[in-house]
Amino acid sequence: QSYLLTSRWIGSVVGEVEGLDPQDKEKVDFYSRQFLSAMAPSNFVITNPAVLRQTAESGGENLLKGLENLLEDLERGKGRLKISMTDESAFEVGKNVATTPGKVIYQNELMQLIQYEPSTEEVHRRPLLFVPPWINKFYVLDLQPKNSLIKWAVDRGHTLFVVSWVNPRKELARKDFEDYMREGPLAALDAIERATGEREVNVLGFCIGGILMVATLAYLAAKGDTRVKSATFLATMVDLKDIGEVSVFIDEEQLRSLEEHVAEKGYLEGHHMAQMFNMMRENDLIWSFVVNNYLLGRDPMPFDLLYWNADSTRLPATMLVTYLRKIYQDNGLMKPGHLVLDGVPIDIRKIETPSYFVATKEDHIAPWVSS
């Protein structure tokens, strides 16, 4: 009760602070919540009844097993705590996740293009291209047959192609956002035409892959290229005026620090993005596993989505800075000509492609109001 009362009091005090701009207020709210979540009684042995009961019944074996789990996670993270969220040994890409049959028909420095085998006697004439994000792996669209968007599309007669982005190392540090356009969707469109003989395609963009497709459609419109006949967007932000809690991590001071870091490394390590996303759902993605793994001494259950979530990717330095500066900080897609890709000023007002946007009310990463 005292914790709940204190939490409410801190929340009310924080909410009444005057003179803060919206971004600073978002930070105060966010980090106050992080502190309160960390201090919850359930996160401590002596104030968690379930942990006390387990400790008494097992003679403390749960705490010893929890210590083993903690040390294993520190070892996996090479000194950085990488909390296990699922039994990663239970999954293998191509074996029990990402199992829809297909093959790579084209590749370049930034991606491989997968063409999936048809499962119907007849297929639609116009191919379908999926452009997923490169902040994580493509197979979130193909986890299990029962929840695979890829399998669903193939089973409905679509000749499906999916971009699988490379996990970049330092040698790709100079790859920019426009390189992702040239070597991603534009290269894929050419490869699809070579493979099928069909010039016209439908596309689906997801997350940052959707943002890339919005910019690409504006680029194609400026070029008079009408190959893309329809576009569907999932969790895709266009107007980044209101980006919710993500704004906590994107201010001038943090961007300068990030620029210095990636200039030295050549890329942003995957765990930085993973940590940010986990902090936005800290009770579900951090503290529940701290209690389960380290206090109760249990192993996490197999869960395909969390296996994918833990399979993080790196981001090239130049692309990341352009993306965060031009698109996030400057809201560049909403400013005609502010973003220039391959010499072409991007103006999304010129897009005439029929488009459908799917945005969910509770999406904390891509708020629906920004779609």
Annotate each PLM feature.
Residues 172-196:
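Alpha/beta-hydrolase active-site loop
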Residues 69, 73-169:
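Short, surface-exposed "cap/lid" segments of acyl-processing enzymes
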Residues 6, 14-56, 60-63, 194, ...:
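Alpha/beta-hydrolase-fold enzymes
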Residues 309-345, 353:
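Mobile cap/lid helix-loop segments that gate and shape the active-site cleft of serine hydrolases
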Residues 351, 357-359, 363:
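Short beta-strand/loop motif that positions the catalytic acidic residue
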Residues 189-209:
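Alpha/beta-hydrolase fold nucleophile elbow
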Residues 203-205, 234, 358:
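Short beta-strand immediately N-terminal to the catalytic nucleophile in serine-hydrolase-like folds
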Residues 364-370:
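Conserved alpha/beta-hydrolase "acid-adjacent" motif
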